[in-house]
Amino acid sequence: MKRAIAAALVLGAAFSASPAFAQVKQTRDEILFYTADWTGERFPDGRPMVADSLLKRAVNVPIEDVWEYVRERGYRNQFESGWQALHPEKPFAGRALTAQYMPTRADMEKAIKAEGKAEGRTGGTNMWPIAELQTGDVYVADGFGKIVEGTLVGSNLGNAVAARSQTGFVFDGGIRDQEENRQIPNFNGFYRGYDPSAWADMHLTAINAPIRIGRAVVVPGDLVLCKPEGVLFVPALLAEEAIGAAEMTQLTDAFNFELNRSGRNKAEFEGGWTAAKYDAFVKWIEANPDKLKMPRAEFDRLLAERRKKE
């Protein structure tokens, strides 16, 4: 018993002597923990760095095709709809930088602000995630659906998000200064609603932690695809294959539509992919190289995999 008590005292002393860990911004090791299967480049903060070229390709594929690829691999909680947007007609994509907000609780807010002061942070806690943004990021925030006094950006912070990310935001919450935000060049955002009130009675609780946006789960570094239909959060480790598969579906659909219009598909309006049809498809691609957005080597690989399945 004495030995057990002594061991407990030593263990307790060790823990009490350990430095306190940051509670708001996730550490690099914490992000690595949640994204361990990613083998590509990373930002200094640990987030997976999905390639810029892939972000550009993502906006040109139907969201259903990417969703289907992700869902078939067990990621069933990655899509959320029901948004308002600054520019609904303009899709955009980027890498998730996440933030979580909660209703104000005095003791939590005091601790969070003290931590921010020690780290040299300035301004309200709603400014802290913006300072972390990199070019190509999408600022994704869980504002627990609050719109009235839940306005996470107005025109000043909107301009700050645009300047740092050159992309936009996705807020499960509100915004203000909607008209002025719409005038910011090369900037878009999805949000739950507009209200003229300033944000109040809420505070930041996490930066770059896994968060929930409606029925979707978001991990820092996810590829965020925003289109009129809704928002899809694609795990970084699946992003390249998901976009490539969606592009291949686009190509085979376009070829099939052309066959249907010309009557060459006969009764095979969908499917019917024989060896002869695949050969005709390749010739069609060669005659229409502008339709190929992926590298030719990637196309050849995906086509070979598809032919094996038939």
Residue spans for each PLM region:
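Positively charged n-region of N-terminal signal peptides that target proteins for export
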Residues: 1-4
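Feature captures the catalytic cores and cofactor-binding loops of soluble hydro-lyases/lyases
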Residues: 61-65, 69-220, 234-310
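Sec/Tat signal peptide C-region and signal peptidase I cleavage site
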Residues: 18-22
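Bacterial N-terminal signal peptides
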Residues: 6-16
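Buried hydrophobic positions in well-ordered alpha/beta secondary-structure cores of metabolic enzymes
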Residues: 46, 161, 222-224
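N-terminal pre-domain segments of enzymes
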Residues: 23-67, 71-73
